Amino acid sequence: MKPAFEDMNLQIPAVTAEPEDYTGEDGLLYCGKCRTPKEAYFPADKATLFGRDRHPAECDCQRAQRMEREAAEQQRKHRDKVEELKRRGFTDPAMREWTFANDNGRNPQMKTAHFYVEHWEDMKAGNIGYLLWGSVGTGKSYLAGCIANALMEKEISVRMTNFALILNDLAATFEGKNEYISNLCRYPLLILDDFGMERGTEYGLEQVYNVIDSRYRSGKPLIVTTNLTLTELQDPQDTPHARIYDRLLEMCAPVCFSGENFRRESAQNKLNRLKQLMND
């Protein structure tokens, strides 16, 4: 049987010398590019144990190359993670473009979105959400999408959907309604877009309440966008709506959206562009 130190010696790789490398005055191999050692001496009390007096070491350029490779690998893993979160979190590919970077800077409420992302840990701990309410086309969904995209870039899981899709999924699910709702509540942040546009049947209202109440009991924040007014939410027409609206107002801070209709402006811009093309 070989002595243990011989086996240890075999595990120490030899340094590969490049043509430009050289031996320094201390007897160690130096990199010809960065002029730093590619070897280092063992402490005197370890040299006999390992059967040799030196071991490989990273020169400065090798260290820089390794760190560059590690950073590139880390960035690749981050991109893959974010891509997976967006694939799972968004119900419409267009939502990927609803970002702070693409914002036109004309929505005065955008500061509330930045605040939410910057204080996410506090929002999560306090179970604080937003109720984004106001007229059609004022940027509510876009702002909610900005929050979702920004948090996903931080590798935080978000689900952005609407009750029309949820009700369709519940009607078609084979896993059970409770399990489906539980899956929604596993997301650190749930965003419900276009609330109030779903069909108001007894079954539909019951499922809407189940989702919102389950989210409430999960202790996780919720963001909702709606065209309903705050007065309509505070003074509901009947008991089923009152149960739902009370839960929302308890969980979410109201944020009013008013002003210009960005969708109408976008449509007008397209019409003007079409007229210009036809006249060219």
Model-inferred region functions:
Residues 98-123:
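N-terminal pre-Walker A segment at the start of P-loop NTPase domains
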Residues 108-117, 148-189, 199-206:
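Short glycine-rich substrate-engagement loop in P-loop NTPases that contacts/grips substrate
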Residues 1-104, 265-280:
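A short, basic N-terminal segment
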Residues 194-195:
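Walker B catalytic acidic pair
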Residues 61, 105, 163, 257-259:
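Active-site donor-binding loop signature of nucleotide-sugar glycosyltransferases
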Residues 124-144:
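Walker A/P-loop nucleotide-binding motif
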Residues 127-131, 158, 189, 221:
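Residue-level preference for the first positions of well-ordered beta-strands
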